[in-house]
Amino acid sequence: MVPAARVTAIDESLGESAVLLALAATARHALAAPGARPPELIVGHGVLGRLLARVALAEGAFAPTVWERNAARARSDGLYSVVAPDDDPRRDYRAVYDVSGDAAILDGLLDRLAPGGEIVLAGFYPGELSFDFPKAFMREARIRIAAEWKDSDMKAVLAHIDAGRLSLDGLVTHRHDAADAAQAYRRAFEDTDCLKMILDWRHAA
Protein backbone atom coordinates (compact mmCIF):
# COMPACT_ATOMS: atom_id res chain seq x y z
CA MET A 1 0.00 0.00 0.00
CA VAL A 2 1.15 3.54 -0.79
CA PRO A 3 -0.38 6.93 -0.01
CA ALA A 4 -2.80 8.16 -2.67
CA ALA A 5 -0.62 11.25 -3.16
CA ARG A 6 2.14 9.01 -4.53
CA VAL A 7 -0.08 7.32 -7.13
CA THR A 8 -0.97 8.71 -10.55
CA ALA A 9 -3.92 7.52 -12.61
CA ILE A 10 -2.93 6.97 -16.24
CA ASP A 11 -4.67 6.02 -19.45
CA GLU A 12 -4.31 2.32 -20.23
CA SER A 13 -3.62 3.23 -23.86
CA LEU A 14 -0.13 4.40 -22.86
CA GLY A 15 0.88 0.78 -22.48
CA GLU A 16 4.56 0.20 -21.77
CA SER A 17 5.36 3.86 -22.51
CA ALA A 18 3.89 4.66 -19.09
CA VAL A 19 7.21 3.63 -17.55
CA LEU A 20 8.63 6.85 -19.03
CA LEU A 21 6.20 9.20 -17.29
CA ALA A 22 8.41 9.87 -14.26
CA LEU A 23 11.37 10.63 -16.53
CA ALA A 24 9.22 12.92 -18.68
CA ALA A 25 8.10 14.72 -15.52
CA THR A 26 11.76 15.04 -14.49
CA ALA A 27 12.48 16.68 -17.85
CA ARG A 28 9.55 19.03 -17.42
CA HIS A 29 10.73 19.93 -13.90
CA ALA A 30 14.08 21.07 -15.31
CA LEU A 31 12.25 23.36 -17.73
CA ALA A 32 9.72 24.76 -15.27
CA ALA A 33 11.87 26.60 -12.72
CA PRO A 34 10.84 30.24 -12.17
CA GLY A 35 12.44 32.42 -14.83
CA ALA A 36 13.95 29.44 -16.66
CA ARG A 37 14.78 29.86 -20.32
CA PRO A 38 13.85 27.03 -22.66
CA PRO A 39 16.85 25.03 -23.85
CA GLU A 40 18.81 26.31 -26.80
CA LEU A 41 21.31 23.47 -26.39
CA ILE A 42 20.74 20.04 -24.86
CA VAL A 43 23.82 17.92 -24.19
CA GLY A 44 23.13 14.20 -24.51
CA HIS A 45 20.59 12.39 -26.69
CA GLY A 46 19.66 9.52 -24.42
CA VAL A 47 16.12 9.11 -23.13
CA LEU A 48 16.23 12.14 -20.83
CA GLY A 49 17.75 14.36 -23.53
CA ARG A 50 15.07 13.30 -25.99
CA LEU A 51 12.34 13.92 -23.44
CA LEU A 52 13.77 17.35 -22.63
CA ALA A 53 13.59 18.27 -26.30
CA ARG A 54 10.09 16.82 -26.75
CA VAL A 55 8.67 18.46 -23.63
CA ALA A 56 10.24 21.80 -24.55
CA LEU A 57 8.59 21.62 -27.97
CA ALA A 58 5.28 20.61 -26.37
CA GLU A 59 5.47 23.74 -24.23
CA GLY A 60 5.98 25.98 -27.25
CA ALA A 61 9.75 26.43 -27.27
CA PHE A 62 11.79 26.70 -30.44
CA ALA A 63 13.57 23.52 -31.51
CA PRO A 64 16.85 23.17 -29.58
CA THR A 65 20.17 21.93 -30.84
CA VAL A 66 21.19 18.61 -29.29
CA TRP A 67 24.76 17.39 -28.91
CA GLU A 68 25.48 13.69 -29.28
CA ARG A 69 28.87 12.10 -29.95
CA ASN A 70 27.47 8.69 -30.86
CA ALA A 71 26.28 8.83 -34.47
CA ALA A 72 23.96 5.87 -33.87
CA ARG A 73 21.94 8.03 -31.47
CA ALA A 74 21.70 11.08 -33.70
CA ARG A 75 18.25 10.49 -35.20
CA SER A 76 15.55 12.93 -34.08
CA ASP A 77 12.82 12.31 -36.67
CA GLY A 78 13.31 15.86 -37.91
CA LEU A 79 12.01 17.51 -34.75
CA TYR A 80 15.33 19.19 -33.94
CA SER A 81 18.98 19.16 -34.97
CA VAL A 82 21.37 16.60 -33.48
CA VAL A 83 25.07 17.29 -34.06
CA ALA A 84 28.44 16.28 -32.69
CA PRO A 85 29.91 18.98 -30.42
CA ASP A 86 32.90 19.46 -32.71
CA ASP A 87 30.57 20.19 -35.63
CA ASP A 88 28.78 23.00 -33.80
CA PRO A 89 30.53 26.39 -34.08
CA ARG A 90 28.06 28.31 -31.94
CA ARG A 91 29.38 30.03 -28.79
CA ASP A 92 26.46 32.18 -27.69
CA TYR A 93 23.96 29.77 -26.15
CA ARG A 94 21.84 31.42 -23.48
CA ALA A 95 20.41 28.21 -22.01
CA VAL A 96 22.33 24.93 -21.96
CA TYR A 97 20.75 21.82 -20.42
CA ASP A 98 23.22 19.04 -19.69
CA VAL A 99 22.04 15.45 -19.26
CA SER A 100 25.31 13.79 -20.22
CA GLY A 101 26.34 12.77 -16.71
CA ASP A 102 29.88 13.91 -17.55
CA ALA A 103 31.34 15.45 -14.38
CA ALA A 104 34.15 17.08 -16.40
CA ILE A 105 31.94 18.91 -18.87
CA LEU A 106 31.40 22.32 -17.27
CA ASP A 107 34.44 24.11 -18.69
CA GLY A 108 33.55 23.01 -22.20
CA LEU A 109 29.99 24.26 -21.76
CA LEU A 110 31.17 27.59 -20.39
CA ASP A 111 33.10 28.09 -23.63
CA ARG A 112 29.78 27.91 -25.51
CA LEU A 113 27.77 30.15 -23.19
CA ALA A 114 26.61 33.69 -23.96
CA PRO A 115 27.20 36.40 -21.33
CA GLY A 116 24.59 35.98 -18.61
CA GLY A 117 23.70 32.52 -19.87
CA GLU A 118 22.63 29.56 -17.76
CA ILE A 119 23.80 25.98 -17.54
CA VAL A 120 21.23 23.56 -16.13
CA LEU A 121 22.57 20.32 -14.68
CA ALA A 122 19.69 17.91 -15.16
CA GLY A 123 21.57 14.62 -15.26
CA PHE A 124 23.21 12.52 -12.57
CA TYR A 125 26.92 13.00 -11.92
CA PRO A 126 28.81 10.27 -10.04
CA GLY A 127 31.74 12.48 -9.05
CA GLU A 128 32.58 16.02 -8.07
CA LEU A 129 31.94 18.84 -10.55
CA SER A 130 34.34 21.74 -10.90
CA PHE A 131 34.91 24.61 -13.32
CA ASP A 132 37.33 27.39 -14.18
CA PHE A 133 36.02 30.30 -12.12
CA PRO A 134 37.54 33.14 -14.22
CA LYS A 135 35.83 31.72 -17.31
CA ALA A 136 32.47 31.64 -15.52
CA PHE A 137 33.11 35.06 -13.96
CA MET A 138 33.76 36.74 -17.30
CA ARG A 139 30.45 35.44 -18.62
CA GLU A 140 28.50 36.08 -15.41
CA ALA A 141 27.34 32.50 -15.86
CA ARG A 142 24.52 30.96 -13.87
CA ILE A 143 24.55 27.28 -12.93
CA ARG A 144 21.32 25.61 -11.84
CA ILE A 145 20.61 22.08 -10.64
CA ALA A 146 17.32 20.37 -11.47
CA ALA A 147 16.22 17.51 -9.24
CA GLU A 148 13.09 15.42 -8.63
CA TRP A 149 9.80 16.11 -10.38
CA LYS A 150 6.76 17.44 -8.55
CA ASP A 151 3.07 16.66 -8.90
CA SER A 152 2.58 19.74 -11.10
CA ASP A 153 5.18 18.38 -13.54
CA MET A 154 3.39 15.06 -13.88
CA LYS A 155 0.07 16.81 -14.43
CA ALA A 156 1.63 18.97 -17.14
CA VAL A 157 3.15 15.95 -18.89
CA LEU A 158 -0.14 14.05 -18.84
CA ALA A 159 -1.94 17.11 -20.21
CA HIS A 160 0.57 17.37 -23.07
CA ILE A 161 0.08 13.68 -23.89
CA ASP A 162 -3.72 13.93 -23.74
CA ALA A 163 -3.63 16.95 -26.07
CA GLY A 164 -1.35 15.20 -28.56
CA ARG A 165 1.51 17.63 -27.98
CA LEU A 166 3.87 15.05 -26.47
CA SER A 167 4.68 11.54 -27.64
CA LEU A 168 6.64 8.90 -25.73
CA ASP A 169 6.91 6.66 -28.79
CA GLY A 170 10.22 5.13 -29.83
CA LEU A 171 11.97 5.49 -26.47
CA VAL A 172 11.47 1.96 -25.13
CA THR A 173 13.86 0.09 -27.39
CA HIS A 174 14.50 -3.25 -25.67
CA ARG A 175 12.50 -5.81 -23.71
CA HIS A 176 13.54 -8.92 -21.78
CA ASP A 177 11.80 -11.46 -19.60
CA ALA A 178 12.60 -10.95 -15.92
CA ALA A 179 14.34 -14.34 -15.93
CA ASP A 180 16.93 -12.83 -18.28
CA ALA A 181 17.61 -9.87 -15.98
CA ALA A 182 21.39 -10.35 -15.92
CA GLN A 183 21.60 -10.24 -19.71
CA ALA A 184 19.17 -7.32 -19.82
CA TYR A 185 21.24 -5.24 -17.42
CA ARG A 186 24.42 -5.90 -19.40
CA ARG A 187 22.73 -4.81 -22.58
CA ALA A 188 21.16 -1.74 -20.97
CA PHE A 189 24.53 -0.47 -19.77
CA GLU A 190 26.78 -1.65 -22.60
CA ASP A 191 24.70 -1.40 -25.78
CA THR A 192 24.55 2.20 -27.00
CA ASP A 193 21.50 1.33 -29.10
CA CYS A 194 19.56 0.60 -25.91
CA LEU A 195 17.69 3.70 -24.82
CA LYS A 196 15.27 2.13 -22.35
CA MET A 197 15.03 -1.49 -21.25
CA ILE A 198 11.85 -3.07 -19.87
CA LEU A 199 11.83 -6.24 -17.79
CA ASP A 200 8.67 -8.26 -18.39
CA TRP A 201 7.51 -9.92 -15.17
CA ARG A 202 4.33 -11.48 -16.57
CA HIS A 203 5.85 -14.94 -16.82
CA ALA A 204 7.88 -14.83 -13.61
CA ALA A 205 7.11 -17.55 -11.09
Residue locations for each model-derived region?
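Residues in the short beta-alpha loop(s) of Rossmann-like NAD(P)-binding domains
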Residues: 46, 69-70, 125, 149
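Adenosine-nucleotide cofactor-binding segment
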Residues: 42-45, 53, 57-108
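Hydrophobic/small residue at the entry helix of a nucleotide-binding pocket
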Residues: 26, 48, 56
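Glycine-rich phosphate-binding loop and adjacent beta-alpha segment
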Residues: 103-163, 201-205
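Structural detector of well-ordered beta-strand residues that form the stable sheet scaffold
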Residues: 1, 8, 65, 118-120, ...
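NAD(P)H dinucleotide-binding glycine-rich loop of Rossmann-like/cofactor-binding domains
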Residues: 1-43
